[in-house]
Amino acid sequence: MLAVAADIFLTSGSALGIVWHPEAEPNLVTWTDRPNDAVIGRWIRDGVGVKGNGSCVVVSPNYVITTKHQLGDEQSLVIIEGITYTIDWIEGHPEEEVDLRVVKLHSANLSDYVAMYDRRIEAGENTVLGGYGKGRGEPLDYPVGSGNVYGYRWDGSGNTTLHWCTNKVNDTDSLYIYGDFDGLNEGDSTIYEGITAEYDSGGGWFIESGGFWKVAGLSRGVAHVGEEPIDSSSWFRKNTDPDVLYPDYLVAVRISSYANWIESVIDPVCDGPVVGDFNGDCSVDVFDFTEFAENWLRQDCGPDNNYCQGSDFEPDGDVDLDDFGVMAVHWLEYHLD
């Protein structure tokens, strides 16, 4: 499996979604043994007015991690639970072949985030995969019309819907972790067996450790077995002989190889929420007041701009004396864990 790593990289700007078997599609209302929806974000590569092309994972109140190959820059946007966040800066891993970057969000102050899985024993672990993008389309059978299903087409457009599935880590190398898309009750299939498809690159592979969900991988690509080119479909059996098991591969950036680098880039986590801390340094000071002043008397605050970049504390749609009062109450507070 490791030999196909270079071949399963999708073209620049492409990303992934999630496809399940019809009998394995989870009920997201009743399936609670998984990470919170709020730890996955939509990556909007080209900013306002452009559909997204990927996903990201929240790893700190003001930081997400994602892959390099879906492109974008500081003009890109991140949407988490319907709220749009702008970007302060992006730092890609210094090694070119490492498909990983850290993104600093502007005044996000998110309460839901995950730690990095840094134990290098991923092989054999059950995982939960999450990301925005395309899902399962019509079944593929051979001969056509026979009902002998070997896979599914990808369906949907854009990355507006969050999907979750389960899988298992089958193998690892220094850069990546790997899984495959088994048929139900075949191979190492899991309860909600699924595979990434289109518009989910940067989405998370999560492993439960010590009672907490931790991010172990970032979705990067998929491949049919052998030399078969990806054709907007996912297979679990051979396309010319559905009696033969033929599971597609899926791959993710291995977070345990880069957890220390990620931790060195992001700021320390504050000891509880700090109202008015715009720059994420766990204190409310003149730097934060300068940020607040830039939004003073705005009347267009809403989820599309993170309520005027967090300055509309109430929030009621504008930045006024009520918000100034909130800022004053927390002046010079310091909350570093």
Q: Where are these predicted regions, by residue range?
A:
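Bacterial N-terminal signal peptides
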Residues: M1-T11
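Cellulosome-associated attachment modules in secreted, modular CAZymes
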Residues: V269-D337
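A conserved glycine-rich beta-strand in the N-terminal activation segment of trypsin-fold
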Residues: A38-P61, T86
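Catalytic-histidine neighborhood of serine endopeptidases
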Residues: V59-P61, I65-V98, A108, I121-V128, ...
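A structural micro-motif recognizing beta-strand termini
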Residues: W43-R45, V103-L110
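Chymotrypsin/trypsin-fold serine protease catalytic domain
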Residues: H106-I195, S219-H224
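Acidic glycine-/aspartate-rich tracts in secreted/extracellular proteins
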Residues: H69-Q75, H106-S111, Y132-G137, D171-L175, ...
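C-terminal subregion of chymotrypsin/trypsin-like serine protease catalytic domains
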Residues: L16-N36, G54-Q70, N159-W164, V169, ...
